[in-house]
Amino acid sequence: MGRVISSWRVLAVVAALMAMAAVELCAAIPFDERDLESDEALWDLYERWQEHHHVPRHHGEKHRRFGAFKDNVRYIHEHNKRGGRGYRLRLNRFGDMGREEFRATFAGSHANDLRRDGLAAPPLPGFMYEGVRDLPRAVDWRRKGAVTGVKDQGKCGSCWAFSTVVSVEGINAIRTGRLVSLSEQELIDCDTADNSGCQGGLMENAFEYIKHSGGITTESAYPYRAANGTCDAVRARRAPLVVIDGHQNVPANSEAALAKAVANQPVSVAIDAGDQSFQFYSDGVFAGDCGTDLDHGVAVVGYGETNDGTEYWIVKNSWGTAWGEGGYIRMQRDSGYDGGLCGIAMEASYPVKFSPNRVTPRRALGAKETQ
């Protein structure tokens, strides 16, 4: 695997991770049992929360959402008070959203529905990492300079695009030695044959779009807007373009196979992120109650082990740096569940890249390139 980018850039990445942890702590709003003693105290906490997170609510909406806020605050308090679960929760910017609203707004890949409809693009045959042996005990592609900063999808169900981009950014850095931030908005606007922008999509389909359209452009050339738009062919054709040769799927329901892939590159995965404990995750190794309704696309960028021997996946999310551990979550590895915790090993895939990147614009967006 070796060095991906120069040492000074790796140091910059480590410094950025430390800065994100500081941002995460500042983003939390503390409360204690006195804030739960009465509805009046909870209402005061609710108003402090709105001011802290800059969440404007008109009077009628505040009253409508207050019930969800109370339930969430009590849930967070009881979880942290019990302790012993290896992870903590905190009152973040999602504080007055009920579970169904949260799932519909921020966990919108609709992966299960799209696969049931037979809309997943076919992968390249085989699993190129099948023969990998003697895996390192820990891998962190952030520290190898293959992961860009945490991004924020906003109120757009574009998690699939962010998951795709993390994996493509990673393999591009590994193959070329250059870390380049790529455009999620191009995928939202232009990859519309089988994906649906802010209404959901599949990472496999996005990989195939990138392959057949001759690459994906940079974030600076085609910046994120958190909304569906018309494909801007002028922006999308701007060079340089990062090229891939397709994608492969990780053998389903095998965390061992997933580890082989992650040891070699960041991997896109679909998970069930609709649980209340996932919504308010703060820090530690997450081992919450979640099913396998795969509704959210994220990327595994490493794995490791705590001092007490708990194994975990390092997962990059797209809900900004104020959520979780600076925008990341450590999820329990080898949990004993079929498909892994929250289904993390059920639908994993990664881009394959051997071809050089383009230094000239594409001919016409959407026209398939000859291979």
Curated annotation (Swiss-Prot):
It is found in: Protein storage vacuole. Induction: Induced by treatment with gibberellin (GA3). Induced during senescence and pathogen-induced cell death. Glycans are attached at N228. Expressed in germinating seeds. GO terms for cellular component: extracellular space; lysosome; protein storage vacuole. GO terms for molecular function: cysteine-type endopeptidase activity. Residues 29-133 form a propeptide. Keywords: Disulfide bond, Glycoprotein, Hydrolase, Protease, Signal, Thiol protease, Vacuole. Pfam families: Inhibitor_I29, Peptidase_C1. The active site is at C159, H296, N317. One of its GO terms (biological process) is proteolysis involved in protein catabolic process. PROSITE patterns: THIOL_PROTEASE_ASN, THIOL_PROTEASE_CYS, THIOL_PROTEASE_HIS. Disulfide bonds join C156-C198, C190-C231, C290-C342. Residues 1-28 form the signal peptide. Optimum pH is 4.5-6.0. CDD domains: Peptidase_C1A (cd02248). Belongs to the peptidase C1 family. This is Cysteine endopeptidase Rep1.
